[in-house]
Regions:
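Membrane-integral, polyisoprenol-dependent glycosyltransferases
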Residues: 1-299, 303-384
Length: 384
């Protein structure tokens, strides 16, 4: 299947600028005339929903303060410092905070300026599934995918705060889009681009970004048009290498800076960003040993200390199991998405059972993503 470049009709030479702007609303020649206007309308409605009342939005004060400090000093910006003096970092990688800090540097410290990046990220995320799904099943299905994502409650909620999940979702959806393009052509550059997107997502949410890797790799190995399995495995290995390099680039750079010239790394007893990411924000989240050792504690940690125990799924009565997302407080928040994903995957399999090629990768991709997320949710004591 050949991918046709998406180019809108070029305006006539010498046309006024306002007419050139209007061409952005016109669909490319290979799509129905209603496709792009409908997509932009969906994204606009989503942006309004995400940004409504953002001047009085509820934000995380700890990370809001860090973004403000980072906006006032390039030194603090580089290292993700929590305080203006640059003595201690935040307890996570600062990828999402970089975007927020730039917004605050441009517009000044306002709640709406802190939330604005998440609104933009959420609106941009709506555009990407359309392109990925359209390649496989056409523009109508792409619009349905964009609309479903736009009205998903958790998507709206994430776009109305200052948590890092909005950037994580945008980058992972871009990775899935690049992978879908690679599936159709066997393009190594597209697969490497997917690795770059996942690596950047790691800067926003650390190991959670890697949960998508098994699904993306399995989809390419099973459905890419490369003639030999050895070739596909080599492509996946190269993409994995790119992911690792991009993921670990900032951590390595910080580790090379002498400790006296940078802030102390919060979340680590040994001033190591690797300990912060892979222990405090990794293994420690599974074992319950994840109390910050340097920076100011979050309200959740204060409550944990006062009660004498951490607020984990296990201590709240939610036992580890493969169906944990379908029970308790998780069911109302996100559990309903899993049956919908499985039903959608089965529907694709039934509808496309006679069609060979990349469109049949939808089932392993969906199931792989669901399996990765379920394995995380089934951990013995992962925190809420």
């Amino acid at each position: 299947m050949e991918i046709i470049p998406e180019k809108a009709p070029a305006p006539a030479p010498g046309a006024p600028r306002w007419r050139r702007f209007l061409t952005l609303w016109r669909s490319p020649a290979d799509q129905p005339a209603w496709a792009r206007p409908a997509l932009l309308a969906i994204a606009a409605v989503a942006a309004v929903a995400y940004g409504w009342g953002m001047a009085s939005a509820s934000v995380e004060p700890f990370y809001g303060a860090a973004a403000r400090s980072m906006s006032e000093s390039w030194h603090d910006f580089m290292f993700g410092a929590f305080d203006p003096a640059g003595t201690v970092t935040v307890d996570k990688l600062p990828g999402a905070l970089w975007v927020q800090a730039l917004s605050l540097r441009v517009f000044g410290f306002h709640i709406w300026a802190l939330v604005l990046p998440q609104v933009v990220e959420g609106a941009l995320t709506i555009l990407v599934p359309y392109r990925a799904v359209r390649r496989l099943t056409g523009p109508a299905a792409g619009l349905i995918a964009a609309a479903v994502l736009a009205v998903t409650p958790i998507t709206v909620l994430l776009g109305r705060g200052n948590v890092s999940d909005s950037l994580l979702i945008l980058l992972l959806v871009l990775a899935a889009d690049a992978t879908s393009a690679a599936l159709l052509t066997g393009s190594l550059p597209q697969l490497l681009l997917a690795g770059v997107w996942v690596g950047l997502a790691f800067q926003a949410k650390m190991i959670q970004a890697w949960l998508a890797l098994p699904a993306l790799a399995a989809a390419y190995l099973l459905a890419a048009p490369a003639t030999r399995l050895r070739t596909r495995c080599a492509h996946v290995a190269l993409a994995g290498l790119v992911t690792a390099v991009v993921s670990l680039s900032w951590m390595t750079a910080v580790s090379l800076v002498p400790s006296q010239d940078r802030p102390y790394v919060d979340g680590s007893p040994d001033d190591s960003v690797y300990t912060q990411v892979f222990d405090y924000n990794g293994v420690g989240r599974l074992t319950g040993n994840w109390v910050s050792v340097a920076g100011p504690p979050s309200p959740l940690l204060v409550a944990a200390k006062e009660s004498g125990r951490l607020l984990t799924a296990e201590t709240m009565g939610i036992k580890p199991s493969w169906h944990r997302l379908l029970a308790g407080p998780f069911a109302a928040g996100s559990g309903w998405l899993l049956p919908a994903a499985v039903a959608g995957a089965l529907g694709v399999l039934i509808a496309r059972r006679r069609q060979a090629g990349a469109t049949r990768c939808a089932l392993p991709s969906c199931c792989g993503a669901a399996g990765s997320w379920s394995s995380r949710s089934s951990s013995a004591s992962a925190p809420i």
